[in-house]
Amino acid sequence: MSAYAEHIKTVCSRFDKALEDNNFESVLVYSGQPRVDFLDDNAPPYRVNPLFKYWVPVTESPKSAIFYRKGSQRPTVYLFQARDFWHAPVNVPEEEWQQHVDLKIIDDLSMLTEDLGSDLEQSAFIGEDFAQPVSDWRVKARNPQALIDHLHFHRSIKTQWEVDNLREANRLAAKAHVAAKEAFFAGKSELEIHHAYLGAIDFRESQVPYNSIVALNSHSAILHYDVYDTVPPKQIRSFLIDAGARYRGYCSDITRSYAYEEGFYANLVEAMDKAQQELLSEIKPGVSYYDLHVSMHLKVAQILSDFEFIKGDAQSIYDKGYTSAFMPHGLGHFIGLQVHDVGGFLKDDKGNSYERSERHPFLRLLRDIEVGHVFTIEPGLYVVDQLLEEHKDSADINWEKVDELRPYGGVRIEDSIVVGADGNENLTRDAFKELGAE
């Protein structure tokens, strides 16, 4: 059986259990449609419903839908192909997935409702329903949270087909990262580096899974920086790039940091890279991701001590809360159909969830690690003045050292990890190794 055949079998089984547990006979998953801007007739780029592309690798077909009846083991895909002379038709090439579904081409949503008849009224509807006629459809329930929670909990365990797609997404992004790195060392501006990244993989800006972070010098301290200066700085010091790609609807999310010259910042990047790789060896089924996060904070604390940013040993630096000022974000998150993939707070498929940590409120993943999980590991260290204000009177902090780092901004390194029963796969580093880049 092919990887996709196994995948759709798994998806059918997961939907069967979710529908059974929540008293639904069937479900209609709507792909979504563009939403025009306020007082305008233009729409931002369309993003498909993740639960639609969970079934089939179709990401550019708005107004389409998937109907699945519990126990049928075969979904019906209503693929919308508009009779439209204004736009290019949606290109859906013949692929294996079409052998595992009943495919029906429609050019009007009334064709879907007529085909389903009374089945529609017995279905759970999952998707956006802001526009007619979808908002007028009579369905049993719209976006029932219990059903969605059930599906989201199990989406954390990736099928082999999903891992294969994530691997390809990392290969694409690694290729683009290499081009961006070359542009950085060639003295290009942030915008030029951004263009080099997109050009290396022939992506439009709307095709990357999130706004790429392309940050030179002190901009690296802005966690979600996406301004892109058009002129390079007079003195180039550092480069942080956080950017991904998509393949068949699956996302990659890679961060790398580079020093323009050898010295203090280059040593800091090397230390963070070493600490990150040490943490990777701690990833095992049954380990709490929260405990991994704390372990990384202790490693960051050791770096703060080793580089004389803060006086004291690693444990005392962590206990006093200093690491949260230098690494305010979480260690990572699930990744898959979405960059910040779902289910990170769910305890079970009944919707019970973990409370966010008071000490680490921005951590997006609190579950114990399981075989089949795919998540990012992305430690960082930055000069964020807003966060350092709380410690402005601290005698423990070596402010001269902080000032030395300030023009470099910060450092972050991010890989995606597949958890296996007999060892883990680093999708990101493997992709760079294939290119001879790491």
Curated annotation (Swiss-Prot):
Q: Which cofactors are named for this entry?
A: Mn(2+)
This entry's comment on the bound cofactor is: Binds 2 manganese ions per subunit.
Keywords of the record: Dipeptidase, Hydrolase, Manganese, Metal-binding, Metalloprotease, Protease
Per the UniProt entry, the signal peptide is none
Q: Which Pfam families match?
A: PepQ_N, Peptidase_M24
**GO molecular-function terms, A-Z:** aminopeptidase activity; metal ion binding; metalloexopeptidase activity; phosphoric triester hydrolase activity; proline dipeptidase activity
Q: Which PROSITE patterns match?
A: PROLINE_PEPTIDASE
Q: Which domain of life is it from?
A: Bacteria
Please give an example of a GO cellular component term from this record: cytosol
**What's a GO biological-process term for it?**
proteolysis
Keyword field contains Transport: no
EC number, UniProt record:
3.4.13.9
Q: Which residues bind Mn(2+) 2?
A: 242, 253, 414
Q: Which residues are involved in binding Mn(2+) 1?
A: 253, 333, 378, 414
Give me the reactions it catalyses. Xaa-L-Pro dipeptide + H2O = an L-alpha-amino acid + L-proline
Q: Which HAMAP family match?
A: X_Pro_dipeptid (MF_01279)
Q: Which family, according to UniProt?
A: Belongs to the peptidase M24B family. Bacterial-type prolidase subfamily.
Record function comment: Splits dipeptides with a prolyl residue in the C-terminal position.
Q: What is this protein called?
A: Xaa-Pro dipeptidase 2
Q: Which gene encodes it?
A: pepQ2
